[in-house]
Amino acid sequence: MTLLNNKVAIITGASSGIGRATALLFAAQGAAVVINARGERALNEVAETIADLGGRVHAVVGDVGLAQTHERLVQAAADRFGGLDIAVNNAGAVGAIKPLAELPLEEWHHTLNANLTSAFLGARSQVPSMLARGGGAIVFTSSFVGTSVGLPGMAAYGAAKAALMGLVKGLTADYAVKGIRVNALLPGGVDTAMAGDDAQKEWAAGLHAMKRIASPGELAQAALFLASPMASFVAGSALYADGGNAAVK
């Protein structure tokens, strides 16, 4: 069974990690995927992999902190595949890691732009296209940082990721009645470049009840659930995929 047959999905941050795994999985589940990242070479490699496996894919290089990037993504979904049903607003950045009193204002703005403003810009562009199709599903990649735990030097990142939950709830209040489900995926530690070196990954594993970090594919499966008909009555929710961190913190 293909859960996303004939659906069209936008996935940002798709050149590596959770975004790459999500793009591959969604394409395997029948969706046409419009993928985005800033790095052209890595993004094109993902697109080639999907195409070689028989998937439908189109790559759009761009910075999700800019409104025009999201407009181009939505337009590509319409032009190439006929519309938009699903968006996984996954792109983000940890930003500078330092105590809040030492954080320059420009770094604060950079971190919020990469993680929160980018999500707002994405949803603002995506909602009208979904309404034209009678509904859809939006998934934001948040984090256990800021929602379940605070980590040293990551106040800006945690604030941005926690604020995504306010965006999820507000969008749900506005658009659930019109058929758009909006939810957040909250990963714990994940085996990606963002997680750091082996020592940092081992430290992160200790934060979880399962005493390990996730693979990107495990998070992609959670995103698939939220985007698919399996979650047809799930709206305005936070799905912790954190290896039990929230249960034992």
Regions flagged by a language model, labelled:
Residues 123, 160, 168:
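Active-site helix of classical SDR
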Residues 98-100, 107-112, 204:
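Substrate-binding pocket helix/loop in short-chain dehydrogenase/reductase
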Residues 94-97, 224, 235-249:
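Short C-terminal tail/terminal secondary-structure segment
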Residues 208-219, 230:
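A conserved structural motif in NAD(P)-dependent oxidoreductases
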Residues 176, 181, 234-236:
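Short, small/polar-rich loop/turn modules that mediate ligand/substrate recognition or access, typified
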Residues 128, 147, 169, 173-174, ...:
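Alpha-helical segment proximal to the catalytic Tyr-Lys
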Residues 8, 15-16:
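Conserved glycine-rich cofactor-binding loop
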